[in-house]
């Protein structure tokens, strides 16, 4: 299951049941606002979804086959007053050939970041969202994240000394950093305006402009999850319990 929660508590989710997919949209009291039953023919298999911060927009990425080619579609649904006169609340959509969009993130009330297997795209609009920025990468993208107006991509590196490469962009598509990484990471996330790379026992922290702040061992067992608590404090969920660390 994949789910997205808007600021006021409404929830949208992709549900799977007996090999079939459903997209459900629920109010704060649990009542159903909308429901759809997409399939591979129309509009495709739902890969991910994201609600706008005000809950009026839902962005959904689909994958489908057309003429023997795999395609993807990014669709935007309006559940405000403007969407009442639209067929199935669909305001706009964009289709792409030979690429998939496994992840889509909301960047406010009228902006979205869609991650593809070859890069990312930015969509903007209050009536009919459309693509405004397109960034493509030649290398293999291993991980991606968005928060605080920053798009972070981890690509496979070109040497054993630097197995990964991190690129940071703003929402205009401007590249802010391109760093070779010697840290063997397993997870990427953005917390408290910091880029966090973790593996079993280690943490590596970068600023949103690509400056390394810390790299070292923070757990004697195994890190399951890490949460930013503000003021350079992080809560570690470890194999044997929970601990708090503070970085100088």
Regions found by a protein language model. Give the residues of each.
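Repeated scaffold domains used in trafficking and secretory/extracellular systems
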Residues: 1-8, 41-52, 90-105, 135-149, ...
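Structural motif
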Residues: 19-25, 66-77, 117-124, 160-167, ...
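Short loop/turn segments that connect beta-strands within beta-propeller blades
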Residues: 27-30, 78-82, 124-128, 169-172, ...
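Recurrent small/Gly-Pro-centered beta-turn motifs in extracellular repeat architectures
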Residues: 13-16, 60-64, 115-116, 154-157, ...
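Intrinsically disordered, low-complexity segments enriched in Gly and acidic/Ser/Thr residues
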Residues: 130-222
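Solenoidal tandem-repeat scaffolds enriched in leucines and small polar residues
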Residues: 44, 49-127
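Hydrophobic beta-strand positions that form the internal "hydrophobic ladder"
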Residues: 10-12, 56-58, 111-113, 151-152, ...
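A short beta-strand motif characteristic of beta-propeller blades
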Residues: 1, 31-40, 83-95, 128-135, ...
């Amino acid at each position: 299951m994949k789910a997205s929660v808007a600021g006021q508590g409404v929830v949208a989710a992709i549900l799977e049941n007996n090999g079939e997919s459903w997209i459900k949209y629920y109010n704060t009291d649990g009542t159903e606002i909308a429901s759809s039953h997409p399939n591979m023919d129309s509009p495709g298999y739902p890969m991910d979804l994201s609600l706008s911060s005000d809950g009026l927009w839902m962005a959904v990425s689909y994958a489908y086959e057309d003429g023997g080619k795999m395609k993807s579609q990014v669709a935007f649904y309006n559940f405000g007053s403007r969407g009442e006169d639209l067929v199935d609340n669909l305001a706009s959509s964009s289709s792409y050939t030979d690429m998939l969009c496994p992840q889509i993130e909301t960047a406010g009330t009228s902006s979205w970041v869609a991650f593809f297997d070859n890069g990312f795209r930015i969509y903007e609009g209050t009536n009919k969202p459309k693509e405004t920025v397109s960034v493509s990468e030649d290398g293999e993208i291993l991980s991606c994240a968005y928060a605080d107006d920053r798009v972070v991509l981890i690509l496979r590196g070109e040497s054993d000394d630097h197995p990964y490469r991190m690129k940071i962009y703003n929402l205009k598509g401007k590249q802010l950093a391109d760093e070779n990484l010697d840290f063997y990471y397993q997870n990427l996330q953005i917390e408290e305006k910091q880029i966090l790379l973790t593996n079993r026992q280690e943490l590596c922290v970068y600023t949103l402009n690509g400056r390394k702040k810390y790299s070292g061992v923070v757990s004697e067992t195994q890190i399951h999850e890490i949460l930013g608590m503000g003021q350079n404090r992080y809560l570690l969920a470890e194999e044997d319990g929970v601990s708090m660390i503070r970085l100088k």
